[in-house]
């Protein structure tokens, strides 16, 4: 409550919320403050979003990264609130951040602490071969060779020995990138693109948002002729996990 009250006092434009008690408090104490339903509420249908609109007065909902483009379009058509979708950043194999793996290792809830890997639980150490070990909560989750770039250390994207082979046991580091879908997302009425930014640097924020701002402006001005520029792909690849991009559930190639 105190964080919400302070944000309102400072003149915040909106709050991103998942906790229903906080929503109820804000609607009662700060009726003029916009409430955006967090992705961690896991609202994937019009009915779920409508419940939050009627009960708590939300004005925008952030959709989880589990829907196809067609499903997103259906939610946009049926909803009476703005719809925001993820456009770039890390993917989550858990229920959008509510990760029991991270909680088990660090003793902190990512949902409440706001980070997958709390800084105090992360430890980097050089090894005799010139590489680097990455530990989370005292558990070794990866080893990087001297020539390898290091990724944001999360348990779900660590490399472990399984059946005598070392590799990614749960998920390979790959970033969501929906630049190619911009004309389609704009046409269906998506209100905003969300760029994942947990524990990212100021340089990441500046460079990634600059690329997306330019691409969105071009797509909005002339959607029929929009094409992703190679320079944009290269710029985002520098910030992509594993330097790989995917459309994720938006296209579901695994079906």
Residue ranges and their predicted role:
Residues 1-43, 62, 70-192, 199-255:
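Active-site pocket-lining/capping segments in soluble small-molecule metabolic enzymes
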Residues 44-48:
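Short, glycine/polar-rich helix-capping loops at beta-to-alpha or helix-loop-helix junctions
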Residues 55-58, 85:
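A cross-taxonomic marker for long C-terminal extensions/tails that follow the last structured domain
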Residues 65:
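Cys/His-rich Zn2+-binding cysteine-cluster or related metal-binding knuckle/ribbon modules and their
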């Amino acid at each position: 409550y105190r964080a919400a009250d302070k944000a309102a006092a400072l003149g915040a434009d909106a709050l991103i919320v998942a906790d229903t008690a906080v929503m109820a408090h804000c609607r009662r104490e700060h009726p003029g403050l916009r409430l955006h339903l967090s992705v961690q509420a896991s609202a994937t249908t019009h009915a779920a979003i409508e419940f939050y609109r009627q009960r708590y007065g939300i004005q925008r909902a952030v959709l989880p990264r589990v829907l196809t483009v067609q499903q997103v379009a259906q939610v946009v058509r049926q909803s009476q609130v703005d719809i925001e979708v993820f456009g770039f950043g890390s993917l989550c194999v858990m229920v959008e951040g509510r990760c029991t793996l991270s909680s088990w290792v660090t003793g902190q809830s990512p949902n409440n602490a706001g980070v997958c890997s709390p800084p105090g639980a992360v430890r980097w150490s050089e090894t005799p071969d010139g590489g680097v070990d990455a530990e989370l909560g005292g558990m070794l989750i990866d080893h990087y060779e001297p020539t390898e770039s290091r990724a944001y250390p999360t348990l779900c994207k660590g490399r472990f020995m399984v059946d005598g082979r070392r590799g990614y046991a749960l998920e390979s580091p790959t970033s969501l990138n929906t630049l190619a879908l911009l004309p389609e997302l704009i046409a269906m009425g998506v209100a905003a693109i969300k760029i994942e930014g947990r524990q990212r640097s100021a340089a990441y924020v500046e460079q990634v948002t600059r690329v997306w701002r330019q691409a969105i402006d071009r797509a909005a001005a002339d959607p029929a002729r929009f094409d992703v520029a190679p320079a944009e792909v290269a710029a985002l690849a520098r910030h992509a996990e594993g330097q790989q991009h995917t459309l994720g559930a938006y296209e579901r190639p695994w079906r």
